[in-house]
Amino acid sequence: MNREERLKRQERIRNFSIIAHIDHGKSTLADRILEKTGALSERELREQTLDMMELERERGITIKLNAVQLTYKAKNGEEYIFHLIDTPGHVDFTYEVSRSLAACEGAILVVDAAQGIEAQTLANVYLAIDNNLEILPVINKIDLPSAEPERVRQEIEDVIGLDASEAVLASAKVGIGVEDILKQIVEKIPAPSGDPDAPLKALIFDSLYDPYRGVVAYVRIVDGTVKPGQRIKMMSTGKEFEVTEVGVFTPKPKVVDELMVGDVGYLTASIKNVQDTRVGDTITDAERPAAEPLPGYRKLNPMVFCGMYPIDTARYNDLREALEKLQLNDAALHFEPETSQALGFGFRCGFLGLLHMEIIQERIEREFHIDLITTAPSVVYKVYLTDGTEVDVDNPTNMPDPQKIDRIEEPYVKATIMVPNDYVGPVMELCQGKRGTFVDMQYLDEKRVMLIYDIPLSEIVYDFFDALKSNTKGYASFDYELIGYRPSNLVKMDILLNGEKIDALSFIVHRDSAYERGKVIVEKLKDLIPRQQFEVPVQAAIGNKIIARSTIKALRKNVLAKCYGGDVSRKRKLLEKQKEGKKRMKQIGSVEVPQEAFMAVLKIDDQKK
């Protein structure tokens, strides 16, 4: 192809993604677009075609982003090339969203005609605005009896400030309005700007590991072209590779001769090491490299940490391999080895949030068949010592000695909660119970309110989301962003079993709620830990001070069964002998802690409600 043909082709490319709150119909709309452009035959279409992972289909959510190339014949006879990049809607996966938006020029904003704007809609729209994308509002599900398209249109204008007069009214389920959406994509979304003759610049926005071809990098070409046989260089590491194959997804991978400006596709270059293709890195030509890399993504810091240990310690290396493979296409996962006296060898893993943690855990158990024990999630605390040094603590067992601590700061988040009027009371109560401070409250319309609170992240990590949903019968939606660290009065609580600290059960808690929490945990553990032959005290302690205790009663055999009648001193002798034996057992006996006990420490709040 000569330069002219390339530029002509470039003008007909449209790169866009679909953004929406969970359940507003994003994946269904993607299905309709695939169907309308003839990317898949009727036979191949299944619901949520782009959600390839079994877990995604089961939970009905999108976790990974996915890219597809489609061809669309417009009314004017021109053939356009669409690249649709599907994005997740859940708050834990905003990073995935920001990655897919960086590879686009436009975004379709899907809003449910019955529910209106939700918290995550807002979060994702702001990401799109930051990336200077052209946003096309679509009001979906207009076939529902409860749909109020006009109210939602007004809401889009008032809350986001987008002009919604030309918003498409659609129903992805029945296929209404899909043609209009395709028409708007052609008319409103700009073609990619890039120079086909400049040195190659390609953004890696995802990657996955293929046992036969090595690492497969998903790329968006910004400048130049890439074809097999070309030497490429990673700009962050400076490593060089030779391209072996390039292709596009139509949803299935299809090999092509070259990828040009604006294309979204994949390339393989016999890259064996997972670490060499960092998501967000720029690929350039090794012979004539680009002057500077593309502005990458911001470095992602995990917010929530927990320990993961294989139940069978011999599978420690399998777990490491599993985590490495997952990390390859999940840039936000972070892990390092750690050991625990109670659980043996394992890893300390960092996640973006609780859903992220749950999904990684489930993927390890499903895809790699490793049974896991996970410890209570914790956040990163900044601990300032009396000698002026500062330590980051993401594991309660690493907390320095209380005498050496000057102050502890914990991460706070700004929580945006959208909630129907009737539930404002319970939600405010919940936020205050979680040590939240009230910031702002706005009425979106006569039925819905937006509440903004500053809440410690550690309070959200446990079960804030579940509590919020149950307090509002599932109507509230919620989104949060980190706003920095603030000093708090925190203490580390240890749990002692039979006088021994169980390191995996330690956690950090606010001093005011320490006593309550200690009491609840001790009671709960008493029910969960199986009874032993001797009695076991369960204690909660702050430093050396025991603040709560309960006792697991011993199992005992009836030693008097064989004495029919007989003298009382004979019975006493047998009882004394049993007591002696139990005492000896207690000195050498150890207690097994079941997995439920670790999870119980998290879910204590159930008791309080």
UniProtKB/Swiss-Prot annotation:
Keyword Nucleotide-binding in record: yes
In what way does this protein cross or attach to the membrane?
Peripheral membrane protein
Subcellular localization(s) per the UniProt record? Cell membrane
Q: Does the keyword Nucleotide-binding apply?
A: yes
Reactions that this protein is recorded to catalyse: GTP + H2O = GDP + phosphate + H(+)
Residues the entry annotates as binding GTP: 23-28, 140-143
The record's Gene Ontology biological-process terms are:
positive regulation of translation
Q: Which residues form the tr-type G domain?
A: 11-193
| Annotated EC | 3.6.5.n1
Q: Pfam families, from UniProt?
A: EFG_C, GTP_EFTU, GTP_EFTU_D2, LepA_C
Q: For this UniProt entry, what is the primary localization, expressed as one broad class?
A: membrane
Signal peptide range: none
Against PROSITE patterns, the record matches this protein to: G_TR_2
Q: Which GO terms describe its molecular function?
A: GTP binding; GTPase activity; ribosome binding; translation elongation factor activity
The protein's role, per its UniProt record:
Required for accurate and efficient protein synthesis under certain stress conditions. May act as a fidelity factor of the translation reaction, by catalyzing a one-codon backward translocation of tRNAs on improperly translocated ribosomes. Back-translocation proceeds from a post-translocation (POST) complex to a pre-translocation (PRE) complex, thus giving elongation factor G a second chance to translocate the tRNAs correctly. Binds to ribosomes in a GTP-dependent manner.
Q: What is this protein called?
A: Elongation factor 4
Source organism per UniProt: Geobacillus thermodenitrificans (strain NG80-2)
Gene encoding this polypeptide? lepA
